[in-house]
């Protein structure tokens, strides 16, 4: 995840990504929809040639970088994440890898000194300012013909729906007491998801239809190779190629 920039700082509703970081992986490990996203990404990597350079934008606690580093140990990988707690979690998790660099700059501040062959951006774009410009930045960071793996939460977050879904799964997996314990440990996630919903409603965070994000991606200089709704229908996944 990537936090908001100062452009939105005058608005009162925005997620506290540092608070989110503390419990993010706990709940993600028990969320089948999130695990399905990771499996999709792993499957995608199995279909491409080894990238020389990989950038992950808004890499959060490093789950996608972890998969990329395992799949491509010879690639140079840079994880960009402005939030201090998120990137600390990522550094701890990924400490065994020698091919990962960490950068706290926001996307709009990243130069293209070393263009990538693959850019990963998962559940981050919607929380950035000026998404059309940020999509152009993603294109700027890619070599011509390079690939963008983009997943974006563009549809309104129904927190009650997610709570029901996760609790039902956890109850089957861990029993009632176990489910309640995990929910209590991950209560900050529920709080921040409620804030995300409010930020979507007030326009601080970007919402879009599948057609709208496809149009924005195309305008930014990409050909869309694949698009589908994922994450219980709340997110759009697009695999794109940078136009020459």
Task: Report residues per predicted region.
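Conserved class I S-adenosyl-L-methionine
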Residues: 1-49, 63, 67, 86, 149-180
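Class I SAM-dependent methyltransferase SAM/SAH-binding core
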Residues: 55-109
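A short SAM/SAH-binding and catalytic strip from SAM-dependent methyltransferases
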Residues: 118-131
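A short acidic, Gly/Pro-enriched loop at the edge of an enzyme's catalytic core
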Residues: 110-119
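Short alpha-helix
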Residues: 203-220
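Core SAM-dependent methyltransferase catalytic element
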Residues: 220-222, 226-244
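A short glycine-rich, Lys/Arg-flanked "PGG" loop and its adjoining helix->strand segment in the class I
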Residues: 132-144
């Amino acid at each position: 995840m990537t936090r908001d920039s100062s452009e939105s700082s005058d608005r009162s509703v925005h997620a506290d990504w540092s608070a989110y970081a503390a419990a993010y992986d706990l709940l993600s490990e028990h969320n089948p929809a999130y695990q399905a996203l990771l499996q999709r990404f792993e499957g995608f990597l199995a279909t491409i040639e080894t990238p020389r350079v990989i950038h992950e934008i808004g890499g959060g606690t490093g789950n996608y970088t972890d998969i990329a580093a395992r799949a491509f140990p010879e690639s140079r990988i840079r994880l960009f994440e402005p939030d201090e707690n998120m990137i600390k979690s990522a550094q701890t998790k990924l400490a065994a890898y020698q091919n990962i660099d960490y950068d706290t700059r926001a996307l709009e501040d990243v130069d293209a000194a070393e263009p990538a062959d693959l850019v990963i951006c998962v559940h981050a774009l919607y929380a950035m300012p000026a998404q059309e410009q940020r999509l152009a930045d993603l294109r700027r960071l890619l070599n011509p013909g390079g690939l963008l793996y983009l997943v974006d939460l563009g549809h309104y977050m129904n927190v009650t729906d997610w709570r029901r879904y996760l609790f039902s799964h956890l109850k089957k997996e861990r029993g009632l007491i176990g489910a309640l314990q995990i929910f209590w440990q991950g209560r900050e996630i529920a709080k921040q998801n409620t804030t995300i919903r409010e930020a979507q409603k007030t326009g601080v965070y970007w919402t879009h239809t599948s057609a709208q994000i496809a149009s924005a991606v195309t305008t930014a200089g990409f050909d869309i190779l694949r698009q589908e709704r994922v994450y219980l229908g709340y997110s759009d996944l697009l695999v794109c190629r940078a136009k020459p």
